[in-house]
Swiss-Prot record:
GO terms for molecular function: 2-isopropylmalate synthase activity; acetyl-CoA C-acetyltransferase activity; manganese ion binding. Homodimer. It comes from Shewanella sp. (strain W3-18-1). Its cofactor is Mn(2+). It is an enzyme of class 2 (transferase). SUPFAM superfamilies: 2-isopropylmalate synthase LeuA, allosteric (dimerisation) domain, Aldolase. This is 2-isopropylmalate synthase. One of its GO terms (cellular component) is cytosol. Gene3D superfamilies: 1.10.238.260, 3.30.160.270, Aldolase class I.
Length: 522
Protein backbone atom coordinates (compact mmCIF):
# COMPACT_ATOMS: atom_id res chain seq x y z
CA UNK A 1 0.00 0.00 0.00
CA UNK A 2 1.25 3.49 -0.87
CA UNK A 3 2.47 5.74 1.94
CA UNK A 4 1.20 8.83 0.09
CA UNK A 5 -1.94 10.42 1.57
CA UNK A 6 -4.08 12.35 -0.92
CA UNK A 7 -5.19 15.73 0.41
CA UNK A 8 -8.72 16.57 -0.76
CA UNK A 9 -9.59 20.15 0.14
CA UNK A 10 -13.26 21.12 0.44
CA UNK A 11 -12.88 24.68 1.73
CA UNK A 12 -14.81 26.06 -1.24
CA UNK A 13 -17.67 23.58 -0.89
CA UNK A 14 -18.18 22.29 2.66
CA UNK A 15 -16.19 25.17 4.15
CA UNK A 16 -18.28 27.81 2.42
CA UNK A 17 -21.43 26.32 3.94
CA UNK A 18 -20.35 27.84 7.26
CA UNK A 19 -20.27 31.40 5.95
CA UNK A 20 -22.93 34.02 6.63
CA UNK A 21 -22.49 35.36 3.08
CA UNK A 22 -21.33 33.54 -0.04
CA UNK A 23 -17.95 34.26 -1.56
CA UNK A 24 -17.81 35.97 -4.94
CA UNK A 25 -16.43 34.14 -7.96
CA UNK A 26 -13.30 36.30 -7.75
CA UNK A 27 -12.80 35.45 -4.07
CA UNK A 28 -13.29 31.74 -4.71
CA UNK A 29 -10.74 31.88 -7.51
CA UNK A 30 -8.24 33.58 -5.18
CA UNK A 31 -8.65 30.78 -2.66
CA UNK A 32 -8.44 28.10 -5.36
CA UNK A 33 -5.16 29.53 -6.65
CA UNK A 34 -3.81 29.60 -3.08
CA UNK A 35 -4.82 25.96 -2.64
CA UNK A 36 -2.99 25.11 -5.86
CA UNK A 37 0.17 26.79 -4.51
CA UNK A 38 -0.31 24.89 -1.27
CA UNK A 39 -0.20 21.66 -3.23
CA UNK A 40 -3.58 20.07 -2.55
CA UNK A 41 -4.17 17.03 -4.75
CA UNK A 42 -7.91 17.57 -5.21
CA UNK A 43 -10.02 20.65 -4.53
CA UNK A 44 -13.79 20.37 -4.28
CA UNK A 45 -14.98 23.79 -5.35
CA UNK A 46 -18.76 23.71 -5.36
CA UNK A 47 -22.13 22.12 -5.98
CA UNK A 48 -22.97 23.24 -9.57
CA UNK A 49 -26.63 22.26 -9.62
CA UNK A 50 -27.39 24.33 -6.51
CA UNK A 51 -27.27 27.76 -8.19
CA UNK A 52 -26.07 29.60 -11.32
CA UNK A 53 -23.46 31.34 -9.16
CA UNK A 54 -22.03 28.05 -7.93
CA UNK A 55 -22.00 26.69 -11.49
CA UNK A 56 -20.10 29.77 -12.70
CA UNK A 57 -17.53 29.62 -9.91
CA UNK A 58 -16.88 25.89 -10.48
CA UNK A 59 -16.46 26.49 -14.21
CA UNK A 60 -14.15 29.49 -13.68
CA UNK A 61 -11.93 27.58 -11.28
CA UNK A 62 -11.93 24.47 -13.49
CA UNK A 63 -10.75 26.59 -16.42
CA UNK A 64 -7.93 28.18 -14.38
CA UNK A 65 -6.44 25.49 -12.14
CA UNK A 66 -3.84 23.25 -13.77
CA UNK A 67 -1.85 21.48 -11.05
CA UNK A 68 -4.63 20.22 -8.78
CA UNK A 69 -7.59 18.09 -9.76
CA UNK A 70 -10.84 20.07 -9.62
CA UNK A 71 -13.90 18.33 -8.20
CA UNK A 72 -17.60 19.17 -7.94
CA UNK A 73 -20.29 17.62 -5.77
CA UNK A 74 -23.55 16.05 -6.92
CA UNK A 75 -26.32 14.08 -5.33
CA UNK A 76 -27.04 10.63 -6.76
CA UNK A 77 -29.24 12.25 -9.41
CA UNK A 78 -28.61 12.52 -13.13
CA UNK A 79 -29.44 16.26 -13.26
CA UNK A 80 -26.84 16.92 -10.55
CA UNK A 81 -24.23 14.85 -12.33
CA UNK A 82 -24.99 16.58 -15.64
CA UNK A 83 -24.46 19.99 -14.05
CA UNK A 84 -21.20 18.91 -12.43
CA UNK A 85 -19.90 17.40 -15.67
CA UNK A 86 -20.81 20.48 -17.69
CA UNK A 87 -19.17 22.88 -15.24
CA UNK A 88 -16.03 20.74 -15.01
CA UNK A 89 -15.70 19.94 -18.72
CA UNK A 90 -13.35 22.91 -19.28
CA UNK A 91 -10.77 21.44 -16.85
CA UNK A 92 -7.67 19.52 -17.87
CA UNK A 93 -8.47 16.93 -15.20
CA UNK A 94 -11.54 16.68 -13.02
CA UNK A 95 -13.47 14.50 -10.60
CA UNK A 96 -17.20 14.06 -10.06
CA UNK A 97 -18.12 13.40 -6.43
CA UNK A 98 -21.55 11.86 -5.98
CA UNK A 99 -23.13 10.84 -2.69
CA UNK A 100 -26.17 9.37 -0.98
CA UNK A 101 -27.11 8.73 2.63
CA UNK A 102 -26.56 5.22 3.99
CA UNK A 103 -27.36 5.36 7.72
CA UNK A 104 -30.68 3.91 8.86
CA UNK A 105 -31.96 7.24 10.18
CA UNK A 106 -31.13 8.99 6.90
CA UNK A 107 -32.46 6.22 4.66
CA UNK A 108 -35.75 5.93 6.52
CA UNK A 109 -36.36 9.50 7.71
CA UNK A 110 -34.78 11.64 4.98
CA UNK A 111 -34.90 9.51 1.84
CA UNK A 112 -37.94 7.44 2.89
CA UNK A 113 -36.70 4.44 0.94
CA UNK A 114 -35.41 0.97 1.66
CA UNK A 115 -31.67 0.37 1.84
CA UNK A 116 -31.84 -1.76 -1.32
CA UNK A 117 -33.44 1.13 -3.20
CA UNK A 118 -30.72 3.49 -1.97
CA UNK A 119 -28.03 1.02 -3.02
CA UNK A 120 -29.57 0.85 -6.50
CA UNK A 121 -29.56 4.67 -6.73
CA UNK A 122 -25.90 4.78 -5.70
CA UNK A 123 -24.86 2.23 -8.31
CA UNK A 124 -26.81 4.06 -11.00
CA UNK A 125 -25.25 7.40 -10.08
CA UNK A 126 -21.70 6.04 -10.18
CA UNK A 127 -22.28 4.37 -13.55
CA UNK A 128 -23.81 7.54 -14.95
CA UNK A 129 -20.92 9.70 -13.69
CA UNK A 130 -18.44 7.30 -15.32
CA UNK A 131 -19.82 8.39 -18.71
CA UNK A 132 -18.08 11.73 -18.17
CA UNK A 133 -14.87 10.76 -16.38
CA UNK A 134 -12.93 7.79 -15.05
CA UNK A 135 -12.36 9.74 -11.82
CA UNK A 136 -15.56 9.23 -9.84
CA UNK A 137 -15.77 9.47 -6.07
CA UNK A 138 -18.69 8.06 -4.14
CA UNK A 139 -19.59 9.04 -0.57
CA UNK A 140 -21.68 7.07 1.91
CA UNK A 141 -23.20 10.00 3.79
CA UNK A 142 -23.38 9.41 7.56
CA UNK A 143 -21.21 6.31 7.23
CA UNK A 144 -20.23 6.67 10.88
CA UNK A 145 -23.76 5.69 11.91
CA UNK A 146 -24.40 3.17 9.13
CA UNK A 147 -24.76 -0.52 10.13
CA UNK A 148 -21.46 -2.11 9.14
CA UNK A 149 -23.08 -4.85 7.01
CA UNK A 150 -24.91 -2.23 4.95
CA UNK A 151 -21.78 -0.11 4.65
CA UNK A 152 -19.76 -3.05 3.34
CA UNK A 153 -22.47 -3.84 0.78
CA UNK A 154 -22.62 -0.22 -0.38
CA UNK A 155 -18.84 0.14 -0.72
CA UNK A 156 -18.50 -3.12 -2.68
CA UNK A 157 -21.33 -2.17 -5.04
CA UNK A 158 -20.00 1.35 -5.66
CA UNK A 159 -16.54 0.04 -6.50
CA UNK A 160 -18.04 -2.57 -8.83
CA UNK A 161 -20.01 0.24 -10.54
CA UNK A 162 -16.79 2.13 -11.26
CA UNK A 163 -16.04 4.43 -8.31
CA UNK A 164 -12.28 4.85 -7.91
CA UNK A 165 -12.49 6.69 -4.59
CA UNK A 166 -14.84 5.65 -1.78
CA UNK A 167 -15.41 8.26 0.88
CA UNK A 168 -16.40 7.27 4.42
CA UNK A 169 -17.76 10.39 6.13
CA UNK A 170 -18.36 10.85 9.83
CA UNK A 171 -20.98 13.37 8.77
CA UNK A 172 -22.16 14.40 12.22
CA UNK A 173 -18.84 13.98 14.04
CA UNK A 174 -20.25 11.15 16.15
CA UNK A 175 -17.53 8.51 16.25
CA UNK A 176 -14.44 8.30 18.44
CA UNK A 177 -11.03 7.30 16.98
CA UNK A 178 -11.05 3.64 18.04
CA UNK A 179 -14.56 3.21 16.65
CA UNK A 180 -13.83 5.01 13.38
CA UNK A 181 -10.57 3.12 12.91
CA UNK A 182 -12.46 -0.14 13.37
CA UNK A 183 -14.94 0.87 10.63
CA UNK A 184 -12.08 1.43 8.17
CA UNK A 185 -10.35 -1.80 9.19
CA UNK A 186 -13.59 -3.78 8.80
CA UNK A 187 -14.04 -2.46 5.26
CA UNK A 188 -10.54 -3.63 4.35
CA UNK A 189 -11.24 -7.03 5.90
CA UNK A 190 -14.68 -7.65 4.42
CA UNK A 191 -14.99 -5.84 1.07
CA UNK A 192 -13.43 -8.17 -1.55
CA UNK A 193 -12.73 -5.48 -4.20
CA UNK A 194 -11.48 -2.82 -1.77
CA UNK A 195 -8.05 -2.82 -3.43
CA UNK A 196 -9.62 -1.32 -6.57
CA UNK A 197 -10.38 2.02 -4.90
CA UNK A 198 -8.79 4.61 -2.64
CA UNK A 199 -10.53 4.81 0.72
CA UNK A 200 -11.16 8.39 1.78
CA UNK A 201 -12.47 9.91 5.01
CA UNK A 202 -14.40 13.10 5.67
CA UNK A 203 -14.69 13.83 9.40
CA UNK A 204 -16.64 16.60 11.10
CA UNK A 205 -15.65 18.20 14.37
CA UNK A 206 -18.85 18.13 16.43
CA UNK A 207 -17.03 16.35 19.28
CA UNK A 208 -13.64 17.86 18.47
CA UNK A 209 -12.34 14.57 17.04
CA UNK A 210 -12.20 15.20 13.28
CA UNK A 211 -8.40 15.31 13.06
CA UNK A 212 -7.91 12.40 15.45
CA UNK A 213 -10.43 10.28 13.54
CA UNK A 214 -8.77 11.12 10.21
CA UNK A 215 -5.31 10.19 11.46
CA UNK A 216 -6.66 6.93 12.89
CA UNK A 217 -8.27 6.19 9.53
CA UNK A 218 -5.01 6.50 7.59
CA UNK A 219 -3.33 4.28 10.18
CA UNK A 220 -5.92 1.65 9.21
CA UNK A 221 -5.45 2.00 5.45
CA UNK A 222 -7.36 5.07 4.25
CA UNK A 223 -5.28 7.09 1.79
CA UNK A 224 -7.32 10.25 1.23
CA UNK A 225 -8.30 12.83 3.84
CA UNK A 226 -10.96 15.44 3.11
CA UNK A 227 -10.34 18.66 5.01
CA UNK A 228 -10.58 22.45 4.94
CA UNK A 229 -8.32 25.41 5.64
CA UNK A 230 -8.65 26.47 9.30
CA UNK A 231 -11.13 23.62 9.76
CA UNK A 232 -14.07 25.76 8.62
CA UNK A 233 -17.27 24.02 7.68
CA UNK A 234 -20.79 22.99 8.59
CA UNK A 235 -21.66 23.34 12.31
CA UNK A 236 -18.46 22.83 14.35
CA UNK A 237 -16.38 22.55 11.20
CA UNK A 238 -14.30 20.00 9.34
CA UNK A 239 -10.98 18.31 9.73
CA UNK A 240 -8.27 20.99 9.58
CA UNK A 241 -5.94 20.69 6.59
CA UNK A 242 -3.03 22.44 8.28
CA UNK A 243 -3.23 20.14 11.30
CA UNK A 244 -3.32 17.00 9.13
CA UNK A 245 -0.39 18.20 6.99
CA UNK A 246 1.80 19.04 9.97
CA UNK A 247 0.90 15.89 11.93
CA UNK A 248 1.94 13.74 8.97
CA UNK A 249 5.12 15.81 8.48
CA UNK A 250 6.09 16.09 12.16
CA UNK A 251 5.32 12.45 13.00
CA UNK A 252 6.51 10.93 9.72
CA UNK A 253 8.92 8.68 11.59
CA UNK A 254 6.08 7.10 13.53
CA UNK A 255 3.28 7.17 10.96
CA UNK A 256 5.38 6.53 7.84
CA UNK A 257 3.05 8.65 5.71
CA UNK A 258 3.49 11.79 3.60
CA UNK A 259 1.56 14.36 1.57
CA UNK A 260 2.34 16.66 -1.34
CA UNK A 261 1.57 19.79 0.70
CA UNK A 262 3.99 22.72 0.47
CA UNK A 263 3.87 23.54 4.17
CA UNK A 264 5.53 26.93 3.70
CA UNK A 265 2.27 28.12 2.12
CA UNK A 266 0.14 27.14 5.13
CA UNK A 267 0.28 30.44 7.01
CA UNK A 268 -0.39 32.56 3.94
CA UNK A 269 -3.31 30.38 2.83
CA UNK A 270 -4.80 30.36 6.33
CA UNK A 271 -4.69 34.16 6.47
CA UNK A 272 -6.28 34.51 3.03
CA UNK A 273 -9.17 32.19 3.89
CA UNK A 274 -9.68 33.88 7.25
CA UNK A 275 -9.84 37.33 5.64
CA UNK A 276 -12.02 36.47 2.64
CA UNK A 277 -14.41 34.35 4.69
CA UNK A 278 -14.49 36.86 7.55
CA UNK A 279 -13.79 34.06 10.02
CA UNK A 280 -11.02 34.99 12.48
CA UNK A 281 -8.72 32.18 13.55
CA UNK A 282 -8.81 31.63 17.31
CA UNK A 283 -5.52 32.62 18.93
CA UNK A 284 -4.85 29.16 20.39
CA UNK A 285 -5.65 27.28 17.15
CA UNK A 286 -3.06 24.61 16.43
CA UNK A 287 -0.50 25.45 13.72
CA UNK A 288 -1.99 28.77 12.51
CA UNK A 289 -3.28 30.51 15.66
CA UNK A 290 -1.57 33.73 16.75
CA UNK A 291 -0.27 31.97 19.87
CA UNK A 292 0.86 28.75 18.15
CA UNK A 293 4.53 29.77 18.28
CA UNK A 294 4.31 32.28 21.14
CA UNK A 295 6.02 31.68 24.49
CA UNK A 296 5.23 33.70 27.61
CA UNK A 297 6.46 31.48 30.44
CA UNK A 298 9.91 32.49 31.65
CA UNK A 299 10.96 28.83 31.94
CA UNK A 300 9.83 28.11 28.37
CA UNK A 301 11.51 31.26 27.06
CA UNK A 302 14.77 30.28 28.74
CA UNK A 303 14.58 26.85 27.13
CA UNK A 304 13.79 28.33 23.72
CA UNK A 305 16.82 30.62 23.86
CA UNK A 306 19.05 27.64 24.66
CA UNK A 307 17.54 25.25 22.10
CA UNK A 308 14.45 25.90 20.01
CA UNK A 309 13.24 22.30 20.06
CA UNK A 310 12.93 22.31 23.86
CA UNK A 311 9.41 23.70 23.51
CA UNK A 312 8.68 23.57 19.76
CA UNK A 313 8.04 20.36 17.84
CA UNK A 314 8.02 22.25 14.53
CA UNK A 315 9.41 25.59 13.46
CA UNK A 316 7.34 28.63 12.53
CA UNK A 317 9.44 28.85 9.37
CA UNK A 318 8.11 25.43 8.31
CA UNK A 319 4.62 26.91 7.80
CA UNK A 320 5.83 30.18 6.28
CA UNK A 321 6.25 32.34 9.39
CA UNK A 322 9.44 34.30 9.96
CA UNK A 323 10.05 33.40 13.61
CA UNK A 324 8.51 32.44 16.93
CA UNK A 325 7.48 35.04 19.49
CA UNK A 326 8.80 35.43 22.99
CA UNK A 327 6.14 37.60 24.57
CA UNK A 328 7.63 39.94 27.15
CA UNK A 329 5.39 39.71 30.22
CA UNK A 330 5.88 39.81 33.99
CA UNK A 331 6.81 36.11 33.74
CA UNK A 332 9.77 36.81 31.45
CA UNK A 333 13.23 36.50 32.97
CA UNK A 334 16.23 38.81 32.66
CA UNK A 335 17.72 36.60 29.93
CA UNK A 336 14.74 37.34 27.65
CA UNK A 337 15.12 41.10 28.16
CA UNK A 338 18.84 40.86 27.45
CA UNK A 339 18.11 38.79 24.32
CA UNK A 340 15.57 41.32 23.01
CA UNK A 341 17.96 44.23 23.61
CA UNK A 342 20.70 42.36 21.73
CA UNK A 343 18.31 41.71 18.83
CA UNK A 344 17.63 45.45 18.67
CA UNK A 345 21.37 46.12 18.46
CA UNK A 346 22.25 47.14 22.04
CA UNK A 347 25.18 45.83 24.04
CA UNK A 348 24.93 45.39 27.81
CA UNK A 349 27.17 48.47 28.18
CA UNK A 350 24.47 50.69 26.65
CA UNK A 351 22.05 50.39 29.57
CA UNK A 352 21.76 49.36 33.22
CA UNK A 353 20.25 45.88 33.28
CA UNK A 354 19.20 46.01 36.95
CA UNK A 355 17.32 49.27 36.48
CA UNK A 356 15.83 48.18 33.17
CA UNK A 357 14.52 44.89 34.54
CA UNK A 358 13.03 46.56 37.60
CA UNK A 359 11.19 49.12 35.44
CA UNK A 360 10.19 46.40 32.98
CA UNK A 361 8.44 44.38 35.70
CA UNK A 362 6.53 47.46 36.87
CA UNK A 363 5.31 48.18 33.34
CA UNK A 364 4.52 44.51 32.62
CA UNK A 365 2.40 44.27 35.77
CA UNK A 366 0.49 47.34 34.64
CA UNK A 367 -0.10 46.66 30.92
CA UNK A 368 0.47 42.91 30.47
CA UNK A 369 2.54 42.58 27.31
CA UNK A 370 5.56 44.84 26.80
CA UNK A 371 6.74 45.60 23.26
CA UNK A 372 10.18 46.44 21.88
CA UNK A 373 9.44 50.16 21.75
CA UNK A 374 8.39 50.04 25.42
CA UNK A 375 11.67 48.36 26.31
CA UNK A 376 13.75 50.97 24.50
CA UNK A 377 11.92 53.78 26.26
CA UNK A 378 12.47 52.12 29.65
CA UNK A 379 16.18 51.74 28.91
CA UNK A 380 16.93 55.25 27.69
CA UNK A 381 14.22 57.64 28.78
CA UNK A 382 13.90 57.02 32.53
CA UNK A 383 11.45 59.88 33.21
CA UNK A 384 9.48 58.85 30.12
CA UNK A 385 9.07 55.24 31.20
CA UNK A 386 5.34 55.83 31.51
CA UNK A 387 3.59 56.55 28.22
CA UNK A 388 4.41 60.04 26.98
CA UNK A 389 1.08 61.83 26.51
CA UNK A 390 2.32 64.41 24.06
CA UNK A 391 -1.15 64.20 22.52
CA UNK A 392 -4.32 64.30 24.63
CA UNK A 393 -7.82 64.05 23.20
CA UNK A 394 -10.00 66.73 24.78
CA UNK A 395 -13.20 66.51 22.73
CA UNK A 396 -14.66 64.64 19.78
CA UNK A 397 -17.88 65.58 17.97
CA UNK A 398 -19.13 63.50 15.03
CA UNK A 399 -21.99 64.12 12.63
CA UNK A 400 -23.11 61.47 10.14
CA UNK A 401 -25.21 61.66 7.00
CA UNK A 402 -27.05 58.33 6.99
CA UNK A 403 -28.12 58.72 3.35
CA UNK A 404 -24.73 59.55 1.84
CA UNK A 405 -22.54 57.61 4.28
CA UNK A 406 -20.29 60.66 4.74
CA UNK A 407 -19.40 61.75 8.28
CA UNK A 408 -17.77 64.89 9.67
CA UNK A 409 -15.64 64.84 12.82
CA UNK A 410 -14.32 67.76 14.85
CA UNK A 411 -11.58 67.13 17.41
CA UNK A 412 -10.03 69.28 20.07
CA UNK A 413 -6.66 67.85 20.97
CA UNK A 414 -3.77 69.01 23.13
CA UNK A 415 -0.47 68.83 21.27
CA UNK A 416 2.52 69.41 23.52
CA UNK A 417 0.52 71.78 25.72
CA UNK A 418 -1.12 73.64 22.83
CA UNK A 419 -4.83 73.16 22.07
CA UNK A 420 -5.67 72.50 18.42
CA UNK A 421 -9.07 72.10 16.80
CA UNK A 422 -9.52 70.43 13.42
CA UNK A 423 -12.39 69.03 11.37
CA UNK A 424 -12.42 66.44 8.59
CA UNK A 425 -14.80 64.26 6.63
CA UNK A 426 -14.55 60.55 6.07
CA UNK A 427 -16.24 57.39 4.90
CA UNK A 428 -18.07 56.86 8.18
CA UNK A 429 -17.54 58.32 11.68
CA UNK A 430 -14.36 56.39 12.56
CA UNK A 431 -12.65 57.35 9.31
CA UNK A 432 -13.67 61.00 9.82
CA UNK A 433 -12.33 60.99 13.39
CA UNK A 434 -9.03 59.50 12.24
CA UNK A 435 -8.68 62.09 9.48
CA UNK A 436 -9.35 64.94 11.91
CA UNK A 437 -6.78 63.60 14.41
CA UNK A 438 -4.19 63.22 11.65
CA UNK A 439 -4.74 66.87 10.66
CA UNK A 440 -4.45 68.10 14.24
CA UNK A 441 -1.26 66.14 14.98
CA UNK A 442 0.32 66.35 11.52
CA UNK A 443 1.45 62.76 12.10
CA UNK A 444 0.71 60.11 9.49
CA UNK A 445 0.52 56.43 10.32
CA UNK A 446 -0.88 53.43 8.44
CA UNK A 447 -3.43 51.32 10.30
CA UNK A 448 -3.08 47.65 9.41
CA UNK A 449 -5.38 46.08 11.99
CA UNK A 450 -8.58 47.25 13.69
CA UNK A 451 -10.41 45.08 16.23
CA UNK A 452 -13.59 46.00 18.04
CA UNK A 453 -14.57 44.32 21.29
CA UNK A 454 -16.10 44.99 24.68
CA UNK A 455 -14.77 45.20 28.21
CA UNK A 456 -17.29 44.41 30.90
CA UNK A 457 -20.77 42.92 30.77
CA UNK A 458 -24.19 44.22 29.83
CA UNK A 459 -25.07 47.91 30.03
CA UNK A 460 -21.88 48.70 31.93
CA UNK A 461 -19.66 47.35 29.13
CA UNK A 462 -17.17 49.68 27.47
CA UNK A 463 -16.31 49.57 23.80
CA UNK A 464 -12.69 48.48 23.35
CA UNK A 465 -10.79 49.15 20.15
CA UNK A 466 -7.39 47.59 19.48
CA UNK A 467 -5.40 48.86 16.52
CA UNK A 468 -2.03 48.02 15.03
CA UNK A 469 -0.36 50.75 12.99
CA UNK A 470 2.87 51.06 11.04
CA UNK A 471 5.14 54.04 11.57
CA UNK A 472 8.65 54.13 10.08
CA UNK A 473 8.41 50.39 9.30
CA UNK A 474 7.67 49.48 12.93
CA UNK A 475 4.39 48.16 14.32
CA UNK A 476 2.71 49.95 17.23
CA UNK A 477 -0.27 48.70 19.22
CA UNK A 478 -2.91 51.07 20.59
CA UNK A 479 -5.96 50.50 22.78
CA UNK A 480 -8.94 52.78 23.38
CA UNK A 481 -11.80 52.39 25.87
CA UNK A 482 -15.01 54.44 25.92
CA UNK A 483 -18.77 54.06 26.15
CA UNK A 484 -18.89 55.16 22.50
CA UNK A 485 -17.17 53.04 19.83
CA UNK A 486 -16.08 56.06 17.77
CA UNK A 487 -14.51 57.69 20.81
CA UNK A 488 -12.80 54.40 21.71
CA UNK A 489 -11.41 54.29 18.15
CA UNK A 490 -10.11 57.86 18.46
CA UNK A 491 -8.48 57.11 21.82
CA UNK A 492 -6.77 54.04 20.36
CA UNK A 493 -5.33 56.19 17.57
CA UNK A 494 -4.14 58.86 20.01
CA UNK A 495 -2.54 56.09 22.07
CA UNK A 496 -0.57 54.99 19.00
CA UNK A 497 0.33 58.61 18.20
CA UNK A 498 1.88 58.96 21.66
CA UNK A 499 3.82 55.72 21.22
CA UNK A 500 5.24 56.90 17.89
CA UNK A 501 6.17 60.25 19.44
CA UNK A 502 8.09 58.47 22.15
CA UNK A 503 9.72 56.22 19.53
CA UNK A 504 10.96 59.33 17.72
CA UNK A 505 12.61 60.53 20.93
CA UNK A 506 14.24 57.13 21.43
CA UNK A 507 15.50 57.24 17.84
CA UNK A 508 17.04 60.68 18.47
CA UNK A 509 18.72 59.34 21.60
CA UNK A 510 20.08 56.32 19.72
CA UNK A 511 21.45 58.61 17.01
CA UNK A 512 23.26 60.79 19.55
CA UNK A 513 24.55 57.68 21.31
CA UNK A 514 25.95 56.41 18.01
CA UNK A 515 27.64 59.76 17.34
CA UNK A 516 29.22 59.68 20.79
CA UNK A 517 30.54 56.19 20.09
CA UNK A 518 32.04 57.33 16.80
CA UNK A 519 33.67 60.37 18.43
CA UNK A 520 35.00 58.21 21.24
CA UNK A 521 36.55 55.85 18.72
CA UNK A 522 38.44 58.61 16.81
Amino acid sequence: MSNRVIIFDTTLRDGEQALAASLSVKEKLQIAMALERLGVDVMEVGFPVSSPGDFESVQTIARTIKNSRVCALSRALEKDIDAAAQALSVADQFRIHTFISTSTIHVESKLKRSFDQVLEMAVGAVKYARRFTDDVEFSCEDAGRTPIDNLCRMVEAAILAGARTINIPDTVGYTVPSEFGNIIQTLFNRVPNIDQAVISVHCHDDLGLSVANSITAVQHGARQIECTINGIGERAGNCSLEEIAMILATRKGMLGLETGINAKEIHRTSNLVSQLCNMPVQANKAIVGANAFTHSSGIHQDGMLKAQNTYEIMTPESIGLNRNNLNMTSRSGRHVIKHRMEEMGYSEHDYNMDTLYEEFLKLADKKGQVFDYDLEALAFMEAQAEEDNHYQLQQLVVQSDSTEGVATATVRIEVGGEIKTEAATGNGPVDAAYNAIARATDRRIDIISYKLGAKGVGQNALGQVDITAVYHEQNFHGVGLATDVVEASARALVHVMNLTCRADKVADYKQSMQKNRELGGV
